[in-house]
Each structure stands twice: as C-alpha cells, then as structure tokens.
C-alpha cells in the first residue's frame, strides 16, 4: 500500500473534485493539516483518504497501528493483512498485480497459505522480488538435500531482491503439515525465509497441471510475479542471477 504523497495533495484533490459528499466527509479541512487525533502516525486527512478511522489507532484490530501498516505496505483495513512476524518486507505493489495464470510468461496467481508463524502469507506481497517457490515434502530426501542450499541462496541474494518460499505439502506421515511441522522444517535447516503449508499440493498443482509431479519441483517468478520457469530441479546460482 502506497503512502499518500502529502496532505496538501489531498486538499488539492478535494478542491478539484468538489461535491456535497466531499464537503460532508471532509468538513474538518480547516483543522491543523498535521492533526492526528488517534496518535497512530497518520494525519486525520490521510486517514480519510485511506478509509481508516481517525479516532481508532488500529482500525482493523490486528494489533498494528494504522500508520505502521501503511509504512510497511500492509492493509490497515484488513485484519488478516499485517507486517510479517518473520520480518519479510511487503512490496508496495501487492494490490497492483493482475494475475493471468501460472504458466511460463504469465503473471502468477495469488495464493494465501499459513506460514511457520501461523500467519497467512500472500504471494503477491513479494511482488517486488524474484521468488523461488520450492515444492517439497518431509519424506522427499532430495527436497531435504536442497533445503539448506536454498537458505544459502536466500542469504546470498536477499539484498538483491530474492526470496525463497517453501511449499510444504506433506509431513513425514504423508499428511497435511501442521504449523509445528513447518517449524520443524525451519529448525532442521536453519531457515529464515517463509515456509508455508501447501496442503495436498494445492498450489504446486497449479504450476504443473495435468502432470505427474516429481519432487523437488521449483518454480521461479521474476519481479512483478511473471513466471520464468516451473517444475525445475537442481537450481544453481545462475538460475537466480538471470532472474534478478
């Protein structure tokens, strides 16, 4: 979510648009332009433009002040969209992505899956990064073999706008992973990037439709969520560098 340029721009917009509705909603324009009635870091004028409550510092009740959410590009009106416990930055383009599909050259579909912190993670929140989606299971030894290496890649290329998201579809019992299972995977390989529960491979199957999936299966998205390749094994540094 993009922060408004300035309250002055808001005033100019209102003057240009006019109308009774604007007069009703913004009858406080004579007030101090910097007024922040609820102390949440957003001026009352900006709150009106965002549609947040100027008298409630946490409009959506998710535990984060409205100003903090705007600064970190989450949605202050959606109680399920807030800064990640894992510390992964949210791109300000998340609400601009227009999905076309999960085939090479298309713009990847949004997904929302539970991460290792028990929070909903949205793919499009990483719209400003190169994303490696790694489809894996606990019983897949090759998946485990590459997991630590992917963490190394993440550490090496994070500052260049790269992130890994592991799509864990089954635990050691071939059941849908619990949050505890996700945490165990994280601990096993010292992972700091997102690991999410892809129950029954629901997301993985959208990248490899009508085909027998051979794990590990890795899918690369360029910045802007364009699908670069799908279902590839043996990822090397050059695969990442060519998509940064």
What would you call each of these model-derived segments?
Residues 13-16:
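C-terminal motif of bacterial Sec signal peptides marking the signal peptidase cleavage site
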Residues 19-103:
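Extracellular calcium-associated, cysteine-rich motifs in secreted modular proteins
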Residues 2-10:
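Sec-dependent signal peptide recognition
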Residues 214-244:
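Thiol-/selenol-based redox modules, centered on thioredoxin-like
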Residues 110-131, 154-157:
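A short beta-strand-turn-helix
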């Amino acid at each position: 979510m993009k922060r408004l340029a300035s309250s002055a721009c808001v005033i100019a917009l209102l003057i240009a648009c006019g109308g009774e509705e604007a007069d009703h909603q913004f009858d406080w324009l004579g007030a101090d332009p910097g007024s922040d009635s609820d102390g949440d870091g957003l001026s009352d004028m900006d709150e009106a433009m965002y549609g947040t409550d100027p008298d409630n510092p946490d409009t959506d009740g998710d535990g984060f002040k409205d100003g903090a959410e705007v600064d970190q590009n989450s949605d202050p009106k959606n109680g399920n969209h807030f800064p990640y416990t894992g510390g992964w930055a949210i791109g300000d383009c998340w609400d601009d992505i227009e999905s076309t599909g999960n085939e090479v050259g298309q713009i990847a579909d949004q997904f929302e899956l539970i991460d290792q912190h028990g929070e909903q993670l949205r793919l499009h929140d990483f719209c400003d990064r190169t994303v490696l989606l790694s489809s894996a299971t606990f019983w897949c030894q090759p998946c485990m073999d590459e997991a630590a290496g992917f963490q190394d890649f993440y550490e090496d290329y994070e500052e260049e706008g790269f992130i890994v998201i592991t799509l864990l579809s089954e635990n050691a019992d071939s059941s849908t992973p619990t949050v505890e299972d996700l945490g165990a995977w994280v601990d096993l390989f010292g992972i700091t990037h997102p690991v999410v529960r892809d129950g029954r491979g629901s997301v993985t199957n959208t990248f490899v439709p009508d085909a027998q999936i051979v794990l590990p299966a890795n899918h690369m998205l360029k910045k802007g969520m364009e699908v670069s390749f799908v279902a590839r094994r043996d990822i090397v540094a050059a695969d990442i560098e060519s998509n940064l």
